[in-house]
């Protein structure tokens, strides 16, 4: 059983054409600590750019990396392999974009590990127009 990370980005919050997508991935505890240290929402760039790409795809060439720096983190796929999942730190210049970040941790078969004590750290991230959700799934 794992708790999986979901990044849900809503675009067009300022009256533009609305679109929404979700990305799922399971991160290691080390990556979760990195994500919990990020103080801003993890989002895509301006709504004028190309539509969002799948997690394995590279970011659109039109993205302004000086305004929307990216964070690359390795994640475990359902097959046990490694894949890349790209997240963007939200820029205050693009308040129309928002994300919902769902924490992810693998729960060992023997029960909850000592990492459970670190769960509050995942709640301290500052999310702009978003919130942290915790859920469990047996599919991933």
UniProtKB/Swiss-Prot annotation:
Residues 49-58 have a biased composition (Pro residues). Residues 43-77 are annotated as: Disordered. Widely expressed. This is Smith-Magenis syndrome chromosomal region candidate gene 5 protein.
């Amino acid at each position: 059983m794992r708790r999986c990370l979901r990044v849900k980005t809503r675009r067009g919050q300022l009256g533009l054409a609305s679109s929404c997508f979700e990305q799922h991935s399971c991160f290691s505890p080390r990556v979760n600590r990195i994500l919990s240290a990020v103080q801003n929402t993890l989002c895509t760039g301006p709504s004028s750019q190309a539509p969002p790409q799948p997690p394995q795809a590279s970011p659109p060439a039109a993205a302004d990396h000086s305004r929307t720096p990216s964070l690359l983190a390795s994640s475990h796929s359902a097959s046990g392999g490694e894949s890349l999942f790209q997240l963007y730190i939200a820029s205050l210049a693009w308040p129309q974009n928002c994300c919902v970040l769902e924490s992810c941790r693998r729960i060992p078969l023997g029960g909850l590990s000592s990492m459970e004590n670190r769960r509050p750290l995942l709640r301290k991230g500052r999310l702009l127009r978003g919130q942290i959700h915790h859920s469990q799934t047996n599919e991933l």
